UniProtKB/Swiss-Prot annotation:
One of its GO terms (cellular component) is chloroplast thylakoid membrane. It is found in: Plastid, Chloroplast thylakoid membrane. Component of the cytochrome b6-f complex, which mediates electron transfer between photosystem II (PSII) and photosystem I (PSI), cyclic electron flow around PSI, and state transitions. The chain crosses the membrane at residues 286-306. The lineage of its organism: Eukaryota, Viridiplantae, Streptophyta, Embryophyta, Tracheophyta. Gene3D superfamilies: 2.40.50.100, Cytochrome f large domain, Single helix bin. Heme binds at residues 36, 56, 59-60. This is Cytochrome f. It holds the Pfam family Apocytochr_F_N. The gene is petA.
Length: 320
């Protein structure tokens, strides 16, 4: 009887362990699949190199345009829009991780001046929220609140991304001054060609690792190819693995050179970076400017009135 109870207890514990393991696996797998923009953040403390190059270009190799629109000047403690535009042909389809074709996604990285940050939800107007859509922005690092990232998100819906930005107040932040500041932006459309660990994705061209003769091409059951090349120097076999996605350009018996493309380049996306300038304007300076302009207008009005008065006096003297 005691042995039976022991067996039941062991069976129950094993069932619980397996259930917990499955739950952990599902949660972990979901987190990883949804968190790949984080990988770039983990690799670089600062996303902008000393040369000015944004590190996203290390994975997205093709060069494409990106644009940003910000106000020329903003007042302290004010919420404004930074609009990042990532243009591309909406008819294009990209190679997905499973080798099939699908719509392009987009992403953006916005590097603001120190002190500028994402506006809190209670400061964002309903009109701006409508322009933002259902986007969820995040800081590049908890300590770098002036650097914001977003993506991947559907490109057909978010080829223009509206960032709600809160300007700093020099009255409360002593390290912020009323100056002109640069803003940097990077934007990509489509998947990258290189993963953060340096390995290739299936969204790039694959080249021959040796010169020789293509002796065998095997189409793999789950997609992709296994290409065997007989080395031209000593005849030893070199096997190149091609994932599902790129189209094969070579055939068996063909003579190829070192680094010759074995596949087409399926990439239709790319990365671009740009910048803009924004002035953190002193309200007193604005008031002074308005007072100066008002004084000029009043002076012009008085000048016109004085001129008309002089003309009347002159006309009356002539009549006299």
């Amino acid at each position: 009887m005691q042995n039976r109870n022991t067996f039941s207890w062991v069976k129950e514990q094993m069932t619980r362990s397996i259930s917990v393991s499955i739950i952990i696996y599902v949660i972990t797998r979901t987190s990883i699949s949804n968190a790949y923009p984080i990988f770039a953040q983990q690799g670089y403390e600062n996303p902008r190199e000393a040369t000015g190059r944004i590190v996203c270009a290390n994975c997205h190799l093709a060069n494409k345009p990106v644009d940003i629109e910000v106000p020329q000047a903003v007042l302290p403690d004010t919420v404004f829009e930074a609009v990042v535009k990532i243009p591309y042909d909406m008819q294009l389809k990209q190679v997905l991780a499973n080798g099939k074709k699908g719509a392009l996604n987009v992403g953006a990285l916005l590097i603001l001046p120190e002190g500028f940050e994402l506006a809190p939800p209670d400061r964002i107007s309903p009109e701006m929220k409508e322009k933002m859509g259902n986007l969820s922005f995040q800081s590049y690092r908890p300590t770098k609140r002036n650097i914001l990232v977003i993506g991947p998100v559907p490109g057909q819906k978010y080829s223009e991304i509206v960032f709600p930005i809160l300007s700093p107040d020099p009255a409360t932040k002593k390290d912020v001054h009323f100056l002109k500041y640069p803003i940097y932006v990077g934007g990509n459309r489509g998947r990258g060609q290189i993963y953060p660990d340096g390995s290739k994705s299936n969204n790039t061209v694959y080249n021959a690792r040796t010169a020789g003769i293509v002796s065998r091409i095997v189409r793999k059951e789950k997609g992709g190819y296994e290409i065997t090349i007989a080395d031209a120097s000593d005849g030893h076999q070199v096997v190149d693995i091609i994932p599902s996605g790129p189209e094969l350009l070579v055939s068996e018996g063909e003579s190829i050179k070192l680094d010759q493309p074995l596949t087409s380049n399926p990439n239709v996306g790319g990365f671009g970076q740009g910048g803009a300038e924004i002035v953190l304007q002193d309200p007193l300076r604005v008031q002074g400017l308005l007072f100066f302009l008002a004084s000029i207008i009043l002076a012009q009005i008085f000048l016109v009135l004085k001129k008309k008065q002089f003309e009347k006096v002159q006309l009356s003297e002539m009549n006299f």
